[in-house]
Amino acid sequence: MVTDSRTSKSIKNSLVALAFYFINLVLQFFSRKVFLDYLGAEILGLNTTATNLLQFLNLAELGIGSAIACTLYKPLLEKDTVAINEIVSLQGWLYRRIAWIVIVGSLVLMAFFPWIFAKMPLPLWYAYASFGVLLVSALLSYFVNYKQIVLSADQKEYKIQYSYKASMLIKTLCQILAIRYLRDGYVWWLVFAIVASLVLNRMVRQTYPFLETKLGRGRELSRKYPAIIKKVKQLFFHKIGSFALTQTSPIIIYAYTTLTVVALYGNYMLVILGIQTLMTAIFNSMNAGIGNLVAEGNRKQIMSVFEELFSVRFLFTCIMCFGVFMLTPLFVILWVGNEYVMDTMTLLLMTVTLFIQLNRTTVDAYINAYGLFGDIFAPVTEASINICLSVLLGYFWGLNGVLLGVLISLFLVVFCWKPYYLFRKALKQRLKLYIIMYVKHLSVAIVSIILTYSVLKFVPMHSFESALSSFVYGVFITILYTLILLSMFYFLGLGLNRFIRRIQSMMNGRK
């Protein structure tokens, strides 16, 4: 019964997140098209660079949110309202201090804007305006939005989607209209970010009327919950590794190229981020369920669910990456024009990187559920390898060199180390089980690609005259691959069939 409830909540969260995902995805691509048409690639590249600079300052967040989330699972399971209030109060106290660090750091950073954006052909105030709006939006998460962590940890993330995402959709629509019809859309952007934050804060208060944060007790609570402070310190190093992976690349690319190349890279990254967001919408709602499962302590059930989730996520990852490689260039041509297409090697490097990033999520979800953040050398090593190789290889091969540096660091730390750490420290299983599981799934994925192209030999091919017809043919190939892969995953007895039976059992129980 508990398992069915956990699964039911996960499905509800996923369905709501998916609905908002598809609406938001359309608006994102349309708004980017409006940006390019009315503001140009230079301003778009500026916005990407300003975002990355702010993300650097957000390293000060130290991973407090993740530390709080894994600490909340047990009191939420036991309905311990006193502990919940104290933990969220400690989070608010820590976030207030982080907010002031971000403010001071931003002021110092803005003093160097004349040198950072020396090559920019736009007026310097554009950089200050872009960064300022992004800064205010970020500060709202420290002063107002931090309480949403309770909704996520309690598997009620759909309430965040209802209120916050709806406000974000309205914000994006107004931003598009402002850019098209007004001289400056930044004011609209800022106003709706504030409104969305206030709506979310009200939703949390209505859902948890007992939730009363007392920030004045912060220092006292930090002594009462030393495990949280310890996890925060450990997570700081993991944040560094994550930042080096996701946020330094555009800055290094800009150092070796131009804002226009950053914009081209940003177009492709928008497609990839769309895929990552889709996977997040489908699977992240299950993370709180994993935390709840770990809190119960049933080792056999924990391992069984791991195998199911690994299989399902691997299936989706293969489909997504196949589609990205097949369809992205054609989509970019249809979306913004042929001049924004990058070479095949760049796309291949981005696709392989995406494959590793998406496949890591099952291991990461379990690491977060266990609060297993003690391997602080791993993110430091990852960040060092990433930055050093990106700078070195970027010097010789430009954009592709930077991407290769990212890929190598991911392979060594995320692909090789993280599964070993989880299986040894938490699951208490031999790594051999994971390796066999991975090899089986990867072999099926490769065989499915071979079968797909074998079938295509019997399908008449034409020299397509338009990008649209080529795109439609690419969609057909992707669907064919999906059907073959899905059939093989199900009938070969991988974890997918157990997951499907679990869903069927839950649905039958509702009838």
How should these model regions be labeled?
Residues 36-38, 42-43, 158, 169-201, ...:
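Membrane-interface helix-loop junctions in multi-pass transport and translocation proteins
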Residues 1-2, 427-430, 452-511:
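Membrane-proximal transmembrane or re-entrant/amphipathic helices at the cytosolic face
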Residues 12-32, 167, 192-209, 222-292, ...:
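Transmembrane helical elements of multi-pass membrane transporters/channels
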Residues 1-10, 186-187, 203-247, 289-304, ...:
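Interhelical loop/hinge segments that connect adjacent transmembrane helices in multipass membrane
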Residues 1-29, 82-93, 125-127, 208-209, ...:
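N-terminal membrane topogenesis motif
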Residues 62-78, 153, 212-213, 272-311, ...:
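Helix-loop junctions and terminal segments of transmembrane helices
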Residues 95-248, 352, 381, 454:
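Hydrophobic transmembrane helix module of multi-pass membrane transport proteins
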Residues 6-74, 103-109, 137, 171-172, ...:
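Signature of the first transmembrane helix
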